[in-house]
Protein backbone atom coordinates (compact mmCIF):
# COMPACT_ATOMS: atom_id res chain seq x y z
CA UNK A 1 0.00 0.00 0.00
CA UNK A 2 1.39 3.37 -1.04
CA UNK A 3 2.24 5.55 1.97
CA UNK A 4 1.58 9.25 1.28
CA UNK A 5 2.44 12.23 3.46
CA UNK A 6 0.01 14.97 2.44
CA UNK A 7 1.15 18.45 3.53
CA UNK A 8 -1.74 20.93 3.42
CA UNK A 9 -1.78 24.70 3.79
CA UNK A 10 -5.18 24.65 5.57
CA UNK A 11 -6.52 21.60 7.36
CA UNK A 12 -9.96 23.24 7.53
CA UNK A 13 -10.19 23.53 3.74
CA UNK A 14 -12.90 21.21 2.35
CA UNK A 15 -10.74 20.67 -0.74
CA UNK A 16 -8.02 19.16 1.46
CA UNK A 17 -10.58 16.75 2.89
CA UNK A 18 -11.73 15.82 -0.60
CA UNK A 19 -8.19 15.16 -1.84
CA UNK A 20 -7.45 13.03 1.21
CA UNK A 21 -10.61 11.00 0.62
CA UNK A 22 -9.55 10.59 -3.01
CA UNK A 23 -6.16 9.18 -2.07
CA UNK A 24 -7.64 6.84 0.54
CA UNK A 25 -10.28 5.62 -1.93
CA UNK A 26 -7.48 4.95 -4.40
CA UNK A 27 -5.84 2.56 -1.97
CA UNK A 28 -3.21 4.78 -0.34
CA UNK A 29 -2.45 5.12 3.34
CA UNK A 30 -2.44 8.87 4.05
CA UNK A 31 -0.78 10.86 6.80
CA UNK A 32 -2.22 14.39 6.77
CA UNK A 33 -0.22 17.26 8.23
CA UNK A 34 -0.47 21.00 7.84
CA UNK A 35 -1.54 24.38 9.16
CA UNK A 36 -4.94 25.41 10.42
CA UNK A 37 -6.60 28.69 9.41
CA UNK A 38 -9.84 28.21 11.28
CA UNK A 39 -12.27 25.69 12.68
CA UNK A 40 -14.36 23.55 10.37
CA UNK A 41 -15.79 20.38 11.94
CA UNK A 42 -17.14 19.37 8.53
CA UNK A 43 -13.55 18.92 7.29
CA UNK A 44 -12.96 15.97 9.63
CA UNK A 45 -12.06 12.66 7.97
CA UNK A 46 -12.91 9.31 9.53
CA UNK A 47 -9.74 7.35 10.21
CA UNK A 48 -7.38 10.25 9.50
CA UNK A 49 -6.13 12.32 12.44
CA UNK A 50 -4.28 15.38 11.09
CA UNK A 51 -0.99 16.56 12.52
CA UNK A 52 -1.16 20.31 13.16
CA UNK A 53 2.05 22.14 12.33
CA UNK A 54 0.81 25.55 13.42
CA UNK A 55 -1.79 28.24 12.80
CA UNK A 56 -1.92 30.68 9.89
CA UNK A 57 -4.38 33.31 8.63
CA UNK A 58 -5.78 34.37 5.26
CA UNK A 59 -4.09 37.40 3.76
CA UNK A 60 -1.21 37.46 6.27
CA UNK A 61 1.66 36.39 4.07
CA UNK A 62 4.46 37.40 6.44
CA UNK A 63 2.82 35.53 9.31
CA UNK A 64 2.59 32.43 7.13
CA UNK A 65 6.31 32.62 6.34
CA UNK A 66 7.07 32.68 10.05
CA UNK A 67 4.76 29.73 10.68
CA UNK A 68 6.46 27.74 7.93
CA UNK A 69 9.89 28.49 9.39
CA UNK A 70 8.78 27.34 12.85
CA UNK A 71 7.23 24.21 11.41
CA UNK A 72 10.42 23.32 9.57
CA UNK A 73 12.42 23.67 12.78
CA UNK A 74 10.01 21.44 14.72
CA UNK A 75 9.37 18.89 11.99
CA UNK A 76 11.45 16.14 13.57
CA UNK A 77 9.35 16.36 16.72
CA UNK A 78 6.06 16.62 14.81
CA UNK A 79 6.72 13.77 12.38
CA UNK A 80 9.04 11.64 14.48
CA UNK A 81 6.38 8.95 14.94
CA UNK A 82 5.34 8.89 11.27
CA UNK A 83 6.32 6.01 9.02
CA UNK A 84 8.60 7.04 6.15
CA UNK A 85 6.36 7.96 3.22
CA UNK A 86 6.72 6.67 -0.32
CA UNK A 87 5.55 10.02 -1.72
CA UNK A 88 5.11 13.52 -0.26
CA UNK A 89 2.43 15.80 -1.72
CA UNK A 90 2.91 19.51 -0.97
CA UNK A 91 -0.23 21.59 -1.48
CA UNK A 92 0.76 25.20 -2.27
CA UNK A 93 4.08 27.00 -2.18
CA UNK A 94 4.60 27.20 1.57
CA UNK A 95 4.22 23.45 1.89
CA UNK A 96 7.01 22.91 -0.63
CA UNK A 97 9.40 24.31 1.97
CA UNK A 98 8.03 21.91 4.57
CA UNK A 99 8.24 19.04 2.07
CA UNK A 100 11.93 19.65 1.39
CA UNK A 101 12.61 19.65 5.11
CA UNK A 102 10.62 16.43 5.46
CA UNK A 103 12.66 14.78 2.71
CA UNK A 104 15.84 15.68 4.57
CA UNK A 105 14.36 14.17 7.73
CA UNK A 106 13.11 10.95 6.14
CA UNK A 107 15.94 10.51 3.66
CA UNK A 108 16.68 12.14 0.33
CA UNK A 109 14.94 9.60 -1.90
CA UNK A 110 11.29 10.46 -1.17
CA UNK A 111 9.71 12.01 -4.30
CA UNK A 112 7.82 15.31 -3.93
CA UNK A 113 4.61 16.17 -5.77
CA UNK A 114 3.76 19.88 -5.97
CA UNK A 115 0.00 20.50 -5.93
CA UNK A 116 -0.94 24.05 -6.97
CA UNK A 117 -4.61 24.80 -7.66
CA UNK A 118 -4.49 28.61 -7.43
CA UNK A 119 -1.96 31.18 -8.62
CA UNK A 120 -1.64 33.89 -5.97
CA UNK A 121 -1.48 37.45 -7.30
CA UNK A 122 1.90 37.99 -5.63
CA UNK A 123 3.37 35.27 -7.85
CA UNK A 124 2.34 37.26 -10.94
CA UNK A 125 3.82 40.61 -9.97
CA UNK A 126 6.47 41.94 -12.34
CA UNK A 127 8.47 43.71 -9.63
CA UNK A 128 11.14 42.42 -7.28
CA UNK A 129 8.53 40.82 -5.00
CA UNK A 130 7.13 38.69 -7.81
CA UNK A 131 10.57 37.74 -9.09
CA UNK A 132 11.69 36.72 -5.61
CA UNK A 133 8.61 34.58 -5.03
CA UNK A 134 8.95 32.85 -8.39
CA UNK A 135 12.62 32.26 -7.68
CA UNK A 136 11.69 30.76 -4.31
CA UNK A 137 9.11 28.52 -5.97
CA UNK A 138 11.67 27.43 -8.56
CA UNK A 139 14.27 26.65 -5.90
CA UNK A 140 11.88 24.86 -3.55
CA UNK A 141 10.32 22.89 -6.39
CA UNK A 142 13.46 22.05 -8.34
CA UNK A 143 13.37 18.43 -7.18
CA UNK A 144 9.60 17.96 -7.55
CA UNK A 145 8.80 14.93 -9.66
CA UNK A 146 5.25 15.93 -10.58
CA UNK A 147 3.10 19.08 -10.73
CA UNK A 148 -0.63 18.68 -10.09
CA UNK A 149 -2.89 21.54 -11.17
CA UNK A 150 -6.59 21.85 -11.96
CA UNK A 151 -6.89 24.00 -15.09
CA UNK A 152 -5.07 23.95 -18.44
CA UNK A 153 -4.98 27.76 -18.29
CA UNK A 154 -2.72 27.61 -15.22
CA UNK A 155 -0.21 25.66 -17.29
CA UNK A 156 -0.65 27.88 -20.35
CA UNK A 157 -0.42 31.24 -18.59
CA UNK A 158 1.79 30.58 -15.59
CA UNK A 159 3.66 27.32 -15.27
CA UNK A 160 5.07 27.25 -18.80
CA UNK A 161 5.93 30.93 -19.37
CA UNK A 162 6.66 32.21 -15.84
CA UNK A 163 7.23 29.50 -13.26
CA UNK A 164 10.57 27.79 -12.87
CA UNK A 165 8.93 24.47 -11.99
CA UNK A 166 10.30 21.85 -14.36
CA UNK A 167 8.25 18.89 -13.17
CA UNK A 168 5.87 17.34 -15.70
CA UNK A 169 2.31 18.63 -15.17
CA UNK A 170 -0.75 16.51 -14.47
CA UNK A 171 -4.17 18.07 -15.01
CA UNK A 172 -6.45 16.95 -12.18
CA UNK A 173 -9.74 18.81 -12.52
CA UNK A 174 -11.97 19.75 -9.58
CA UNK A 175 -14.48 17.03 -10.31
CA UNK A 176 -17.06 15.71 -7.87
CA UNK A 177 -15.77 12.79 -5.81
CA UNK A 178 -18.15 9.82 -6.07
CA UNK A 179 -17.12 6.54 -4.47
CA UNK A 180 -19.14 3.38 -5.15
CA UNK A 181 -21.54 2.32 -2.44
CA UNK A 182 -21.60 5.61 -0.53
CA UNK A 183 -24.04 8.44 -0.06
CA UNK A 184 -22.07 10.66 -2.44
CA UNK A 185 -23.70 8.94 -5.42
CA UNK A 186 -27.02 10.65 -4.77
CA UNK A 187 -28.15 13.00 -7.51
CA UNK A 188 -30.19 16.16 -7.09
CA UNK A 189 -33.78 16.16 -8.27
CA UNK A 190 -34.13 17.00 -11.98
CA UNK A 191 -33.74 20.67 -12.80
CA UNK A 192 -37.17 22.25 -13.22
CA UNK A 193 -38.50 25.77 -13.48
CA UNK A 194 -40.00 27.20 -10.28
CA UNK A 195 -43.78 27.10 -9.87
CA UNK A 196 -45.71 30.30 -10.71
CA UNK A 197 -44.91 33.08 -8.27
CA UNK A 198 -41.78 31.40 -6.87
CA UNK A 199 -38.31 32.83 -7.59
CA UNK A 200 -35.52 31.43 -9.71
CA UNK A 201 -32.58 30.64 -7.42
CA UNK A 202 -28.90 31.24 -8.12
CA UNK A 203 -26.53 29.22 -5.94
CA UNK A 204 -23.07 30.54 -5.08
CA UNK A 205 -21.40 27.74 -3.15
CA UNK A 206 -17.87 26.99 -1.92
CA UNK A 207 -15.09 29.44 -1.14
CA UNK A 208 -16.88 32.81 -0.93
CA UNK A 209 -14.12 35.35 -1.41
CA UNK A 210 -15.29 37.65 -4.22
CA UNK A 211 -16.62 40.99 -3.00
CA UNK A 212 -17.60 42.02 -6.52
CA UNK A 213 -19.71 38.90 -7.06
CA UNK A 214 -21.53 39.52 -3.79
CA UNK A 215 -22.34 43.11 -4.74
CA UNK A 216 -23.35 42.20 -8.29
CA UNK A 217 -25.69 39.42 -7.22
CA UNK A 218 -27.26 41.62 -4.55
CA UNK A 219 -27.85 44.48 -6.98
CA UNK A 220 -29.25 42.11 -9.61
CA UNK A 221 -31.69 40.48 -7.18
CA UNK A 222 -32.96 43.90 -6.13
CA UNK A 223 -33.34 45.01 -9.75
CA UNK A 224 -35.38 41.91 -10.54
CA UNK A 225 -37.62 42.64 -7.52
CA UNK A 226 -37.66 39.12 -6.14
CA UNK A 227 -37.88 37.14 -9.39
CA UNK A 228 -34.42 35.84 -8.49
CA UNK A 229 -33.12 34.77 -5.09
CA UNK A 230 -29.43 34.35 -4.24
CA UNK A 231 -28.47 31.37 -2.04
CA UNK A 232 -24.96 31.38 -0.53
CA UNK A 233 -23.29 28.37 1.08
CA UNK A 234 -19.73 27.55 2.09
CA UNK A 235 -16.85 29.34 3.81
CA UNK A 236 -16.75 33.14 3.47
CA UNK A 237 -13.27 34.66 3.38
CA UNK A 238 -14.17 37.30 5.96
CA UNK A 239 -10.88 39.13 5.40
CA UNK A 240 -12.08 40.02 1.89
CA UNK A 241 -15.35 41.66 3.02
CA UNK A 242 -16.07 44.69 5.18
CA UNK A 243 -19.03 42.94 6.84
CA UNK A 244 -20.17 39.81 5.02
CA UNK A 245 -22.82 38.78 7.55
CA UNK A 246 -24.26 42.27 7.88
CA UNK A 247 -24.35 42.78 4.11
CA UNK A 248 -26.25 39.55 3.49
CA UNK A 249 -28.59 40.18 6.41
CA UNK A 250 -29.65 43.50 4.87
CA UNK A 251 -30.36 42.06 1.42
CA UNK A 252 -34.04 41.15 0.87
CA UNK A 253 -33.40 38.49 -1.77
CA UNK A 254 -30.16 36.94 -0.54
CA UNK A 255 -29.46 34.40 2.22
CA UNK A 256 -26.44 32.57 3.62
CA UNK A 257 -27.02 28.95 4.66
CA UNK A 258 -23.59 28.15 6.13
CA UNK A 259 -21.08 25.41 5.48
CA UNK A 260 -21.74 22.00 3.98
CA UNK A 261 -19.97 18.66 3.54
CA UNK A 262 -18.41 17.99 0.17
CA UNK A 263 -19.32 15.67 -1.46
CA UNK A 264 -21.97 14.30 0.93
CA UNK A 265 -24.33 17.31 0.86
CA UNK A 266 -24.02 18.33 -2.79
CA UNK A 267 -27.18 16.64 -4.07
CA UNK A 268 -29.29 18.35 -1.42
CA UNK A 269 -27.91 21.87 -1.78
CA UNK A 270 -27.83 21.92 -5.59
CA UNK A 271 -31.32 20.47 -5.63
CA UNK A 272 -32.53 23.73 -4.07
CA UNK A 273 -31.27 26.03 -6.86
CA UNK A 274 -31.60 26.48 -10.62
CA UNK A 275 -28.28 28.11 -11.53
CA UNK A 276 -24.66 27.87 -10.42
CA UNK A 277 -22.63 31.07 -10.06
CA UNK A 278 -19.32 29.96 -11.63
CA UNK A 279 -17.81 33.48 -11.75
CA UNK A 280 -15.00 34.79 -9.56
CA UNK A 281 -13.57 38.30 -9.89
CA UNK A 282 -11.10 37.70 -7.06
CA UNK A 283 -7.69 38.45 -8.62
CA UNK A 284 -9.55 39.41 -11.80
CA UNK A 285 -7.80 38.82 -15.11
CA UNK A 286 -5.35 36.42 -13.53
CA UNK A 287 -6.22 33.48 -11.29
CA UNK A 288 -9.98 34.07 -11.55
CA UNK A 289 -9.82 34.08 -15.36
CA UNK A 290 -7.83 30.85 -15.47
CA UNK A 291 -9.45 28.60 -12.88
CA UNK A 292 -12.11 25.94 -13.36
CA UNK A 293 -13.96 26.12 -10.02
CA UNK A 294 -15.37 23.23 -8.01
CA UNK A 295 -18.86 24.66 -8.30
CA UNK A 296 -18.73 24.34 -12.09
CA UNK A 297 -18.42 20.54 -11.87
CA UNK A 298 -20.72 20.24 -8.87
CA UNK A 299 -23.55 22.18 -10.46
CA UNK A 300 -23.32 20.38 -13.80
CA UNK A 301 -23.14 17.02 -12.04
CA UNK A 302 -26.53 17.82 -10.55
CA UNK A 303 -28.00 19.34 -13.70
CA UNK A 304 -27.86 23.01 -12.70
CA UNK A 305 -27.09 25.71 -15.27
CA UNK A 306 -23.66 27.34 -14.83
CA UNK A 307 -23.19 31.09 -15.28
CA UNK A 308 -19.72 32.15 -16.47
CA UNK A 309 -17.93 35.32 -17.57
CA UNK A 310 -16.85 35.91 -21.16
CA UNK A 311 -13.12 35.52 -21.79
CA UNK A 312 -12.46 33.08 -18.95
CA UNK A 313 -11.35 29.46 -18.97
CA UNK A 314 -14.76 28.55 -17.55
CA UNK A 315 -16.46 30.16 -20.55
CA UNK A 316 -14.17 28.24 -22.89
CA UNK A 317 -15.00 25.02 -21.03
CA UNK A 318 -18.74 25.66 -21.47
CA UNK A 319 -18.33 26.67 -25.10
CA UNK A 320 -16.69 23.38 -26.02
CA UNK A 321 -19.69 21.52 -24.57
CA UNK A 322 -22.35 23.96 -25.82
CA UNK A 323 -23.82 24.36 -22.35
CA UNK A 324 -24.41 27.10 -19.82
CA UNK A 325 -24.77 30.87 -19.75
CA UNK A 326 -22.01 33.37 -20.44
CA UNK A 327 -22.20 37.06 -19.52
CA UNK A 328 -20.86 39.68 -21.92
CA UNK A 329 -20.07 42.11 -19.11
CA UNK A 330 -19.55 42.15 -15.37
CA UNK A 331 -22.59 44.27 -14.60
CA UNK A 332 -26.25 44.04 -13.69
CA UNK A 333 -27.36 44.92 -17.21
CA UNK A 334 -25.53 41.94 -18.72
CA UNK A 335 -26.94 39.61 -16.10
CA UNK A 336 -30.45 40.98 -16.64
CA UNK A 337 -30.08 40.63 -20.41
CA UNK A 338 -29.25 36.94 -20.11
CA UNK A 339 -31.60 35.95 -17.28
CA UNK A 340 -34.39 38.51 -17.54
CA UNK A 341 -36.19 36.97 -20.57
CA UNK A 342 -35.82 33.46 -19.17
CA UNK A 343 -38.72 31.09 -19.91
CA UNK A 344 -39.42 27.57 -18.62
CA UNK A 345 -38.85 26.15 -22.11
CA UNK A 346 -35.50 27.90 -22.44
CA UNK A 347 -34.43 26.63 -19.03
CA UNK A 348 -35.54 23.07 -19.82
CA UNK A 349 -33.51 23.11 -23.03
CA UNK A 350 -30.40 24.33 -21.19
CA UNK A 351 -30.79 21.63 -18.55
CA UNK A 352 -31.29 18.97 -21.22
CA UNK A 353 -28.00 19.99 -22.88
CA UNK A 354 -26.17 19.31 -19.62
CA UNK A 355 -27.88 15.94 -19.21
CA UNK A 356 -26.48 14.86 -22.60
CA UNK A 357 -22.88 15.35 -21.43
CA UNK A 358 -20.78 12.35 -20.43
CA UNK A 359 -21.04 11.98 -16.62
CA UNK A 360 -17.27 11.51 -16.58
CA UNK A 361 -16.98 15.21 -17.39
CA UNK A 362 -18.09 15.98 -13.83
CA UNK A 363 -17.29 12.92 -11.72
CA UNK A 364 -14.12 11.43 -10.22
CA UNK A 365 -14.99 7.87 -9.17
CA UNK A 366 -13.19 5.07 -7.38
CA UNK A 367 -11.59 3.86 -10.61
CA UNK A 368 -10.15 7.34 -11.14
CA UNK A 369 -8.90 7.40 -7.54
CA UNK A 370 -7.12 4.10 -8.04
CA UNK A 371 -5.57 5.29 -11.31
CA UNK A 372 -4.26 8.42 -9.58
CA UNK A 373 -2.65 6.42 -6.78
CA UNK A 374 -1.08 4.05 -9.32
CA UNK A 375 0.37 7.05 -11.14
CA UNK A 376 1.80 8.40 -7.89
CA UNK A 377 3.28 4.98 -7.17
CA UNK A 378 5.36 5.17 -10.36
CA UNK A 379 7.24 8.09 -8.81
CA UNK A 380 8.84 5.69 -6.35
CA UNK A 381 10.86 4.21 -9.21
CA UNK A 382 14.40 5.51 -9.47
CA UNK A 383 14.05 6.79 -13.03
CA UNK A 384 11.74 9.83 -13.33
CA UNK A 385 8.53 9.03 -15.16
CA UNK A 386 7.00 11.23 -17.82
CA UNK A 387 3.45 12.20 -16.87
CA UNK A 388 1.53 13.67 -19.82
CA UNK A 389 -0.91 16.53 -19.46
CA UNK A 390 -4.49 15.40 -19.96
CA UNK A 391 -5.55 16.39 -23.48
CA UNK A 392 -7.30 19.74 -23.63
CA UNK A 393 -10.61 20.10 -25.36
CA UNK A 394 -10.93 22.48 -28.27
CA UNK A 395 -10.77 26.18 -27.53
CA UNK A 396 -13.34 27.65 -29.89
CA UNK A 397 -15.58 30.24 -28.26
CA UNK A 398 -19.30 30.74 -28.57
CA UNK A 399 -19.90 33.22 -25.84
CA UNK A 400 -22.88 35.32 -24.83
CA UNK A 401 -26.18 34.02 -23.51
CA UNK A 402 -27.27 30.39 -23.66
CA UNK A 403 -24.83 28.15 -25.53
From Swiss-Prot:
Pathway: Glycan metabolism; exopolysaccharide biosynthesis. GO terms for cellular component: cytoplasm. The keyword Lipid metabolism does not apply. GO terms for molecular function: glycosyltransferase activity. Transmembrane segments: none annotated. Its main location: cytoplasm. GO terms for biological process: polysaccharide biosynthetic process. Disulfide bonds: none annotated. Keywords: Cytoplasm, Exopolysaccharide synthesis, Glycosyltransferase, Plasmid, Transferase. It is an enzyme of class 2 (transferase). It is found in: Cytoplasm. Its EC number is 2.-.-.-. Essential for succinoglycan (EPS I) synthesis and nodule infection. Glycosyltransferase needed for the addition of the third sugar (glucose), catalyzes the formation of a beta-1,4 linkage between the second and third sugars. This is Succinoglycan biosynthesis protein ExoL. It comes from Rhizobium meliloti (strain 1021) (Ensifer meliloti). The gene is exoL.
Amino acid sequence: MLQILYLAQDLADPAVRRRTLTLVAGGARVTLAGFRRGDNPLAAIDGVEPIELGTTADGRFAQRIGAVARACLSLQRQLGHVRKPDVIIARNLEMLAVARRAVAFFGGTVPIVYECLDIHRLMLRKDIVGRMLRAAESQLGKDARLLITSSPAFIEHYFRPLSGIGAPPMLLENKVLEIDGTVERRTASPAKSPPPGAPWKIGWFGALRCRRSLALLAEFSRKMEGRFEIVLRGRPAYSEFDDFDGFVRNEPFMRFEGAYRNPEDLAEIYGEVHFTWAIDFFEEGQNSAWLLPNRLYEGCRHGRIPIAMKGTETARFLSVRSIGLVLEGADVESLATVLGPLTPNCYADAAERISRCNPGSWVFDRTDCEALVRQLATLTLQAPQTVPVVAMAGSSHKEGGFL
